[in-house]
Regions:
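Extended, subdomain-level signal for the structured scaffold at the beginning of enzyme domains
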Residues: 1-99, 106-111, 127-129, 137-139, ...
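Thr-Gly-centered strand-to-loop micro-motif
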Residues: 54, 144-145, 151
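Residues at secondary-structure transition points
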Residues: 79-83, 121, 152
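Structural detector of well-ordered beta-strand residues that form the stable sheet scaffold
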Residues: 99-100, 121, 138, 149
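Active-site-proximal catalytic alpha-helix in oxidoreductases
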Residues: 104-106, 149-165
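A conserved active-site-flanking secondary-structure segment within enzyme catalytic domains
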Residues: 115-142
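Alpha-helix boundary/capping and short turn/kink residues
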Residues: 120, 154, 167-171
Length: 226
């Protein structure tokens, strides 16, 4: 395989694990170069306070073989309202072999016009909004529709990264990366999905996510969908 350009588009207030989870996996893809792309060279603050340093700007980014958009509701609302960001994503996706997202990053793809008529997933709290960008929700942690690969919320980015490596370089390489990062999750609680979480746990989050859902809906409705 010739050198494979992987690019993550970052923006203020993104959820860092949406980005750093798959980054840790895809940075180990053989014969690849990882690019971290933002509007400018300035450090980009994430939603947990960790600042991220771009390697490229929109102006000097090479053509990408894989483009990945992380999520984070506040950051995504800003990104979909920024025409330069949306245009860059659409332009790079036009020639990329793989167009991908983690969590609510799917809505950046959607506003860029890349989810129309496609199957996709996102964080469980926002799946009802996928239809606003022309996508059909598929209930799965990872959804592949042609060259479009979307992942569920936050930690799904690690599973996504391993799935993409298997797609590109084969299962053996993906398995060696999984072992190398000791990805063998055994969570202390079985509350990682609404289908399994107790009612009291879901109730504790309901107000927060209802407000976030409404905010993201408003952001999508105000955005110019390409």
């Amino acid at each position: 395989m010739s050198n494979f350009n992987v690019g993550f588009v970052i923006f203020p207030d993104l959820t860092q694990l949406d980005f750093t989870g798959p980054l840790q996996v895809l940075a180990r893809l053989p014969q690849s170069t990882t690019h971290i792309i933002a509007k400018s060279e300035a450090p980009v603050p994430s939603d947990c306070g960790l600042s991220l340093v771009p390697t490229h700007t929109f102006a000097n980014c090479p053509a990408l073989d894989l483009i990945c958009i992380p999520g984070g509701v506040s950051g995504v609302i800003g990104a979909i309202g920024d025409r330069e960001t949306v245009a860059f994503v659409r332009q790079q996706a036009g020639s990329a072999k793989y167009v991908t997202s983690v969590c609510t990053g799917a809505f950046v793809l959607g506003v860029a016009g890349l989810l129309k008529g496609r199957r996709a997933t996102t964080h469980w709290a926002y799946t009802d909004l996928l239809s606003l960008v022309g996508a059909t929700y598929e209930k799965s942690r990872i959804v592949k529709d042609g060259n479009l690969i979307t992942a569920g919320g936050v930690t799904a980015g690690i599973d996504f990264g391993l799935s993409v490596v298997a797609e590109i370089a084969g299962e053996v390489i993906a398995r060696t990366i999984q072992l190398g990062i000791e990805y063998d999750p055994v969570p202390p609680f079985d509350s990682g999905h609404p289908d399994r979480a107790r009612a009291a746990v879901k109730s504790a989050l309901s107000s927060r996510y209802e407000k976030a859902n409404l905010a993201l809906r408003a952001g999508i409705e105000q955005a110019t969908i390409l």
